[in-house]
Every structure is written in structure tokens, then in C-alpha cells.
Amino acid sequence: MSNPTGSTSRILDIPCKVCGDRSSGKHYGVYACDGCSGFFKRSIRRNRSYVCKSGNQGGCPVDKTHRNQCRACRLKKCLEVNMNKDAVQHERGPRTSTIRKQVALYFRGHKEVNGSTQHFSSTALPTPTFFTTVRQLEAHNLELAAISTVPERQTLVGLAQPTPKYPHEVNGAPLYLYEFATESVCESAARLLFMSIKWAKSVPAFSTLSLQDQLMLLEDAWRELFVLGIAQWAIPVDASTLLAVSGMNNENTESPKLNKIISEIQALQDVVSRFRQLRLDATEFACLKCIVTFKAGVSTHSGSELRNFRNAAAISALQDEAQLTLNSYIHTRYPTQPCRFGKLLLLLPALRSINPSTIEEVFFKKTIGNVPITRVLSDMYKSSDI
């Protein structure tokens, strides 16, 4: 699925040809939102045949409000606006029902200061190398339809020193992204949270910090990790779907609160869109996750928000390493994009512009109720099942 050519500064202003919602680009030949393009793909891939609820095939309204009410009429509308079935059939799908292969990311080398390697005590930096192995997450048991593939990238090997060896894909296998079905956004969000925690535990440098530091870093960074996950795994963020998921509407929610939630959802859409426009690869996402995770330990806090990390020196050093690694990787992988590193770093503050309470309200309220998300994070991280 490709984005339209030309200016992409406000791609979401182009309406979806199916339901009229803001589109996220061209999908199967027409401008469409994530919800309608995903519905069309699932329907064609699974060869679904729907029956109109009203018995009047094509007579049901298909707009932002009613698009999920009748699948038969929605599919008919997709075909009427010339969504291309062949484009779906010819897309390369997953090789298995779930992704079983992990993409291993290898990071080597130390940060060099004035030509010499900077050393830390065993208590300051538990591991001798930076991120000896960072495993890209497995999408276990995600009952989701594949939406796109990441083109196979040439293995990065044999790079001249002092440039370190950068991430490569195991066996050259491409990474497949999965669509998170709009009918189960809450479940998908819970899985994404689980995946983020599993990712953190897979980073040796992170897991060797004290448990207290690990939990505090997660509590501070879970929002950024979650939004990065939305951008990476293409979870639908159209307002009507998220409002339906949260159960909020004009009848049961006061206008000020509803308007605030809608505004936050729009901000989330903008942030996710900006990341997707840059078409980050798996390595860049991994580096950014490390940066935002360790940034929580070195950010300037004030007043009661001051966090007392036991190993602040190690956390600061690891964040520096993450930035240096990303910078070197981009210079090697994208030599014709000298501003790419700066653009990615400038996007990071936007991740914190989304209120954590909004994410909890929209994505997790039905799942965890009034249980604080920090408690869920702590329980999940301590679980031996992850």
C-alpha cells in the first residue's frame, strides 16, 4: 500500500472514498482510511460472503458512523469505488499463520570519547557491550490479517571500522506487519502492551539494571513505546473506531470530556502519521524504543516527579549509546538522507504530547477497568510468562 505522491503534510485531509472519514493514503487504488482498507483486505483474503442485515443489498448507509453495521453493504461500497481485488490477492502474505521467526538485531561497539573507549564500573554499566542482542518481538497468536510486507533489505555486513556491524535480518527473512482488526482493538492494544514489555525484557542492558530502575523506566516510557508500536504495527487510529471501542458518545459522556478525547485522538493520528510518512525500518524503531526507554532515566523532572534511579549513570550512558547507534546506522543505511536522524529525534517529543490517561481511557478501560496502568505494567513485567 502506497502513499500518494506529492505533499504528504496533511494526507489525512483527503476523505476515504468508502466512508468519508479521513484517509491514510491510497489503498488498493483509492484513497481510504485504515478501517475500510483493512476490512476490504480481510474480506477478499478470506473470500467472505456477507448478507445484508436489512435485506436490501447496498441500501444500508456506509459512513463514519454506520460503516461497521452492515458488512455486505460496506464491501459492496468498496467495490463500487473501484478498490482493486487483484491488488489484495497479489500481495505477499505471511508464510505461516503467525510470525515465528524473530528478527535479531546485533549491536556491537562502545561509545568512544576523544578516541578512547569510555569505561564504567560494573555497577554503572552491567554489560561489557551495548545491546549484544535485541530481539524484535514475535507476534504470538495474533489472529490478524496481514496488511503489508516490508521489502527485503540487504544484509548489512562487512562495514568498514570504526563503524560497527549493524542489525541484519535472520536468514534474510522479511518482516511482515499485521493489521490489527478494528473489531478487537482493545485486545490488540493489550497485546501491544505485552509485546512492548517483552521487548524491554529482551534487551540485556535493560534487564541487568535493578528491578526498581527497570519498573520506573517502563512506567515513564510505556506511553512512547505504545505509540511507537501503533506506528510500527499499523493499528487503526481512526476516531470513529476508537470512540466506538471506548464506548463514549454524546449520550453517556459530557461534552467537554468527549471533545478532549476527540482532540487527543486527532493528536495521536497526527503523531502516528508523521512517523509513518518517514517509513522507518525495524532497526530504527528498535533504536527509538531504546532512546525513549532510557530517556526516562535522564529527563529533567521537577518537584514530586523526581525519580531516584539507583543506576542513573548507566541509564544515561545507554541512552547516549542508543542515539549514537541510530545516528551511525542512518548515516550508513540512508547516506542520501543527511537530515533523517534529526527528523527522527525531533519527532520524539511528540510522543509525550499524548496524555497517558487518554490512552488508558480509549484502549484499556474495557480491559482493565479502573486498575492503574502502572500496576498492570509491574505485574506483567514481573510475570515469568513473559
Curated annotation (Swiss-Prot):
Residues 155-384 form the NR LBD domain. One of its GO terms (molecular function) is nuclear receptor activity. GO terms for biological process: cell differentiation; negative regulation of transcription by RNA polymerase II. Residues 13-90 bind DNA. InterPro entries: NHR-like_dom_sf, Nucl_hrmn_rcpt_lig-bd, Nuclear_hormone_rcpt_NR2, Nuclear_hrmn_rcpt, Znf_hrmn_rcpt, Znf_NHR/GATA. Keywords: Developmental protein, DNA-binding, Metal-binding, Nucleus, Receptor, Transcription, Transcription regulation, Zinc, Zinc-finger. Its main location: nucleus. The keyword Metal-binding applies. One of its GO terms (cellular component) is nucleus. A zinc finger (NR C4-type) spans 16-36, 52-78. It is found in: Nucleus. Prominent expression in the embryonal optic stalk and the distal tip of the forming vesicle. In tadpole-stage embryos predominantly found in the ciliary margin of the optic cup. Belongs to the nuclear hormone receptor family. NR2 subfamily. Monomer. Orphan receptor that binds DNA as a monomer to hormone response elements (HRE) containing an extended core motif half-site sequence 5'-AAGTCA-3' in which the 5' flanking nucleotides participate in determining receptor specificity. Involved in the regulation of early eye development. PANTHER family: NUCLEAR HORMONE RECEPTOR. This is Nuclear receptor subfamily 2 group E member 1. It comes from Xenopus laevis. The gene is nr2e1.
